[in-house]
Structures are given as C-alpha cells and as structure tokens.
C-alpha cells in the first residue's frame, strides 16, 4: 500500500492537505482523485510527497488507479542532498550502470485503464480535459498524435492491442499548442517514456510501440560526462534524464541555455512581467522565440497602444473643451484617467508623453488596469447583450462614496430624478422617521439585521420599478462600496433599458469627518465607520498603493520635521523663517530614526510641510541634531497652501514613488499618519504627543 494511501485511510484528505500541502482534484462521479505535490513544499522528498506526481486514486478505497513517475529531482538539487538518500546514493556512490535519455520538453501524458475503458490523463487531470495555451484540450491533442478519426473506439482498440491493462503508460506530448521551450514538429507527437505496474510500482519498458516516437538514448560512461555534455547543448534542447537499471528515473540534467530560456518563457505566466516586457519593447524578440504565445501577449500590446490610438486622442480633444464637472464625468470610468487629468493640467492631448513620465511600477499598474477594464467590459457586453435592445435616454445613476461625501446633496440637486436611498428606507420602515436612531440600528448584530436589510433591498427595487414604469431617471445615493450592490443596479438597468452610469464622490476623509460632525439635522455617524468606508473607497477609486521598486533602488526612511523631531520654541508651527533653527530637538525620536536607517543602510528623507523659504536654516538644524551630511529634504513650494496630508502625498508621488524602497515613516499628525497607512507603507511610526487632530 502506498504511503499516501495509508495516510488517507488513517487521517483523511484534510490531514494530507494540511500536513503536506498536496493538491487534490476530485472527480466525484467517477470516484477518482488526482494528487499533486506543491512545488515548493519544504517536505519535498518525504515519501508521501514523492508519490503525489499526478497519482490517481479511487476516492473511496484509496486504491491505485494510475501510477505515474515518483517525483525525481534536478541534478543541482541532488548536489544539495535534496531528493532522499536512495537517489543520492545511487547517483554518486554506487557503481551501477545508468541509462541516459534525451529529455523531451513537453507535457506528461499517462494512459491507463479504469472501469473497463482506457483513458488519457495529464499530470493535473484524470481525463486530459484541461486546455493548453491555444484552448485545445490535451485529450484532443493525444488523439491527433495517434492519428485517430473515430476517436473512442479506435483509441480503445489501439490500447487493448499494445498496452498492459494493469499498468500506467507514460508519454511526453509535444506540439505547437503546448510548446514549452524546445521546438518540435507542429503536429502533435507522443514520445514514449516508460510503463509502471499500478500495484507493485515496478517500471518496465515497451520498445516497439508503433504509434509513438522514442527519445534518443546516449551511452555516457558516467553522470559527470552527461553533465558536461548538457553544458554544451546550444539549440534549446532541454537536457537528459538519468534512469537506473530498473527503468526508474533518478534525476534530470538540464542545459544552462534551456534554463535561461525557460525562465524567460515563464514570464508569460506573470502579468507584471508581461507588462514589463511590453513597456520595455522586448515583446517582439520574445515572440520571435515563442510565437505560440502571441495571444497571451496581444492584450498587453493593445493596452500599451491605448495612449496613441484615435479614440484616446478624440477623448482628450473633446475633454479640453469641457468644464471641470463635465470633464470629470467624461473620464471617471477610464482606467487611464490620471493621465487624462495630467493632460488637462498641461493643456495637451499627448497622452503618450504623459504615460512616459510615469515610473515603471506606475506604468505596469496602468497597463494591468487597462487589461482588467477591457476584459470586464467585454464580459459585461457578452452577458448583457441579449437584454439591450435600443440605446435609452433614461438614466440610472449610482453614486459611490463614503458617508459625508455629498451623495445625498448631489442627488437632490438633480432635476427630474427619483432618489433611492437605503437610509431613507431604513428610517421609514423601522425607525418611525427618526434619523437619530440609525446608529443604534447599525449596532445590531448582522444576524438581527439580515432580514431587515433584505426588506430594505426589496423596497428599493420596488421604488426603482415604480420610477421605471413612469420613465423617470433614477439616482441611487447609498455608499455602494461593495460590488454586489453596483452589480444589482447594473442588471436592473440592463433589464429595464436604462443607461447605467456611476459617479465617484471623491472627497478626503477629513472633509467627510468634518461634515459628519455637522449633521445635527440627521445623525452623526460613528467616525470609525466612515474610516472603514474610506478604506473600501480607496480600492474602488484605484488608489495607488506604495509598491517596493526592487533591490536596484536605494532604501529610505521618511521623516517629518515639525512636531515629529522638531518642537518650535520661539515660533508657531506656521512661522517659516530663521527661527526654525531654534527649535527644540526630540532626541529620542531622532535616535530611533537614525538607528532604523543605519540598520537598513537607508537614506533619511525629510518630508516637511514647512515652506521652502526656510530651507537653509532647516538644513542647518538637521545637520546639527542628526549629525549627517547625506540626506534628502523635500519641502512645501512657496506658493502651495494645500493641506498637510495632500502636500505629503504630492511630495511622495513626485520624489519617492518608484525611486526608493521605503522602510518606514515617522510622523505626528493623525491625518498624515492615516495617509501613510492608506499608502500601505510597511511601517508607520505615529509619534504624536496628543491624540487630537490638528
């Protein structure tokens, strides 16, 4: 009995997954399960893990249905004593004669018999039903490789004639549809590897199968000779597989050229690397090597070309003639709207030049956002197309924003619109018209509120249907920060032939909190609730979080001045003159800043709300108390009067983002601290001496 079967019989599936991170794919209707190890599991050479390489078991009895190769390792891993003592001893200490075969660079295919019928499977599936890159199933490719027209009957007859029904027969499949690195014939081809008895696990070799090819066999005198030969491979050949005398594979020896190419090809699995490939103009060279991945690269190329295509230019030509409000409405749903605002500020239609000014992480994020936007739009069009008959002049406008962002005020300013608001419905249904009781309503348990919320949703829909019957425009003025509510209204709009629009009510958290305190006519909401809403809104609004830029860039510790390390003694916080040199130093905080910077070999970057007019005395103070010569100082421009947290965000975007790996930030002002935390700076030290906002 296999180790894994014994473990399953004693501890069940959960024990296997939790302890060894084995992935299981179940086929309930066939009583089958496919087991595969996690590539980077720390117990990679444990007997249980080693057995789980596309192993197929009966999910009721845990008996073996199809038994593939056990896990075997790369030569370099065996040099590090990974792979178990048995393989290591055989390879390096025994005098056994090995067999060396060409390593075929394709997809593992296993053919086995179950419940009286033969089946083809891949490592991750029981019936080869999974798709390759070009959306062809592997089962279809296997049948093409066998040149079978009447697929099922001919496949059964062929297998019955040539294959042992008590064993699993392993092949490598190559074709243009599943190319990895090495180039083979475009037509699907099966390469025979070995066969294995399902019960005993013994390997054997079938040397005269007429429907497949065989890897080339080499007569190297030693493993070392094979390693040296692999180092000389130049034409994308993968390398070799070393087998013992019993036809069991011991290790893979791969060429350096292949490994480098495989690393490049694997970029196609990573959206960030694909975006980087296109941004750097390397995609043509990449496709010259891997033409079968053209469909994978195309969306990224299309996204990159967004900034020069005619529709983008037309949007900007039109946008520059509009007032600010109309411009906001025009660009609010665009995935490149930040570039649109930059173009408006510069009074240019050259979106491409504004894109080129972005840092590489910003460019990558924008390319990915465009792809996401296009795919979502296409999916929505496909889903809703049958329900949309004619363009409609009726509008369903959904406002999205936190409490205190002005949604209700804006909704009431729209003439001829029916407003739908969940709070209004809550108060009407359950609170006898008393808005001051809403906080108590919100404080009820989720379970207690669930039925009531369902009634509220039902009444909101009834209000919409009533408005739709009259042909009235509708505005929904809730927060709408979850996708479920927006999706619901979008479907309602499509069903009732409404033009669906959303509008982001973008205000600062501080503004919303200030408005909340003034809402004596209704109710002041719990401020913590608004803060939680704001966190959700940042995601909805595609807020650009901080992303480390890689080891090639310097590390930085960011530090505020006034209140954080410097305390005014002879001036107010808003006096920017030579008196800043007289500020008292917070030596304990300064010590922490310097220590953290030294530990991480980081530069200290000062981000100050002070006006640049007092730059020199500020530098003198820094050099006196920090005792450093190498640092950066960014200050408020002399004509800038924006709030402190907005200034710090601008300084961060202009001078830090994409240029430094930020270790931590020190600040004392609550609203600024929240801004740093919103950016997801790894560590934010709040050193304020009082919890009050100022």
Swiss-Prot record:
Reactions listed under catalytic activity: a 5'-end dephospho-2'-deoxyribonucleoside-DNA + ATP = a 5'-end 5'-phospho-2'-deoxyribonucleoside-DNA + ADP + H(+); ATP + (ribonucleotide)n-3'-hydroxyl + 5'-phospho-(ribonucleotide)m = (ribonucleotide)n+m + AMP + diphosphate
Binding positions (ATP): 401-408
Pfam family, one: RNA_lig_T4_1
GO MF entries: ATP binding; ATP-dependent polydeoxyribonucleotide 5'-hydroxyl-kinase activity; RNA ligase (ATP) activity
Stretches the record annotates as Bifunctional 5'-OH polynucleotide kinase/polynucleotide 3'-phosphatase: 394-694
GO biological process per UniProt: RNA repair
Protein name per the record: Putative bifunctional polynucleotide kinase/RNA ligase
Primary role: Trifunctional enzyme that possesses a bifunctional polynucleotide kinase/phosphatase activity and an ATP-dependent RNA ligase activity. May therefore play a role to evade an RNA damage-based host response.
Location of the region described as Ligase domain in the Swiss-Prot/TrEMBL record: 1-385
Enzyme Commission (EC) number: 2.7.1.78, 6.5.1.3
Organism: Autographa californica nuclear polyhedrosis virus
Keywords carried by this UniProt record: ATP-binding, Kinase, Ligase, Multifunctional enzyme, Nucleotide-binding, RNA repair, Transferase
């Amino acid at each position: 009995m296999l180790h894994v079967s014994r473990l399953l019989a004693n501890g069940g599936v959960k024990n296997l997954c939790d302890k060894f991170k084995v992935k299981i794919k179940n086929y309930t209707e066939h009583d089958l399960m496919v087991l595969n190890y996690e590539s980077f599991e720390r117990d990679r050479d444990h007997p249980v893990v080693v057995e789980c390489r596309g192993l197929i078991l009966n999910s009721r009895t845990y008996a073996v249905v199809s038994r593939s190769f056990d896990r075997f390792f790369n030569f370099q891993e065996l040099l590090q004593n990974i792979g178990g003592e048995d393989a290591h001893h055989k390879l390096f200490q025994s005098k056994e004669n090995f067999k060396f075969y060409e390593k075929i660079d394709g997809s593992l295919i296993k053919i086995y018999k179950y419940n009286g019928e033969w089946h083809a499977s891949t490592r991750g599936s029981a019936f080869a039903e999974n798709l390759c890159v070009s959306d062809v199933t592997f089962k279809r490719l296997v049948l093409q490789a066998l040149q079978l027209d009447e697929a099922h009957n001919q496949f059964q007859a062929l297998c019955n004639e040539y294959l042992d029904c008590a064993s699993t027969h392993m092949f490598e499949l190559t074709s243009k549809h599943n190319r990895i690195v090495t180039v083979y014939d475009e037509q699907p081809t099966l390469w025979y590897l070995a066969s294995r008895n399902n019960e005993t696990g013994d390997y054997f070799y079938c040397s005269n199968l007429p429907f497949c090819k065989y890897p080339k066999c080499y007569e190297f005198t030693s493993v070392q000779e094979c390693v040296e030969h692999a180092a000389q491979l130049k034409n994308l050949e993968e390398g070799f597989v070393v087998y013992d005398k019993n036809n069991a594979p011991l290790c893979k020896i791969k060429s350096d050229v292949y490994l480098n190419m495989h690393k490049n090809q694997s970029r196609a699995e990573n959206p960030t690397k694909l975006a980087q490939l296109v941004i750097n103009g390397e995609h043509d060279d990449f496709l010259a090597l891997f033409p079968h991945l053209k469909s994978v690269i195309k969306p990224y190329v299309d996204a990159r070309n967004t900034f020069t295509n005619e529709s983008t230019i037309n949007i900007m030509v039109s946008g520059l003639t509009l007032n600010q409000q109309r411009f906001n409405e025009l660009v609010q749903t665009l995935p490149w709207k930040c570039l649109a605002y930059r173009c408006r500020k510069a009074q240019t239609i050259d979106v491409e030049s504004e894109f080129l000014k972005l840092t590489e992480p910003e460019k990558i994020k924008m390319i990915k956002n465009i792809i996401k936007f296009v795919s979502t739009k296409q999916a929505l069009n496909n889903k809703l197309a049958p329900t949309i008959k004619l363009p409609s002049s009726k509008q369903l406008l959904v406002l999205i924003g936190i409490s205190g962002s002005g949604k209700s005020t804006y909704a009431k300013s729209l003439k001829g619109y029916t407003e739908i608001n969940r709070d209004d419905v809550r108060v009407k249904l359950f609170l006898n018209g008393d808005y001051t009781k809403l906080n108590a309503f919100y404080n009820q348990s989720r379970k207690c509120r669930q039925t009531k919320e369902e009634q509220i949703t039902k009444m909101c829909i009834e209000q919409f249907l009533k408005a739709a019957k009259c042909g009235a425009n509708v505005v929904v003025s809730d927060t709408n920060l979850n996708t479920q509510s927006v999706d619901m209204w979008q479907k309602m709009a499509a069903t009732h032939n409404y033009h669906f629009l959303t509008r982001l009510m973008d205000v600062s958290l501080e503004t919303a909190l200030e408005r909340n305190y003034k809402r004596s006519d209704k109710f002041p909401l719990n401020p913590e609730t608004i803060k939680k809403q704001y966190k959700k809104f940042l995601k909805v609004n595609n807020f650009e979080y901080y992303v480390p830029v890689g080891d090639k860039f310097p590390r930085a510790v960011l530090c505020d001045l006034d209140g954080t390390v410097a305390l005014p003694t002879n001036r107010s916080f808003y006096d920017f003159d030579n008196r800043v040199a007289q500020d008292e130093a917070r030596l304990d905080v300064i010590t922490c800043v310097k220590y953290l910077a030294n530990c991480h070999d980081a530069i200290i970057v000062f981000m100050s709300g002070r006006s640049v007019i007092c730059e020199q005395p500020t530098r003198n103070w820094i050099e006196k108390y920090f005792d450093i010569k190498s640092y950066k100082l960014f200050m408020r421009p002399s004509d800038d009067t924006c709030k402190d947290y907005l200034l710090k965000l601008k300084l961060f975007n202009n001078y830090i983002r994409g240029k430094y790996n930020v270790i931590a930030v020190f600040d004392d002002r609550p609203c600024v601290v929240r801004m740093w935390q919103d950016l997801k700076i790894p560590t934010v030290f709040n050193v304020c001496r009082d919890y009050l906002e100022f």
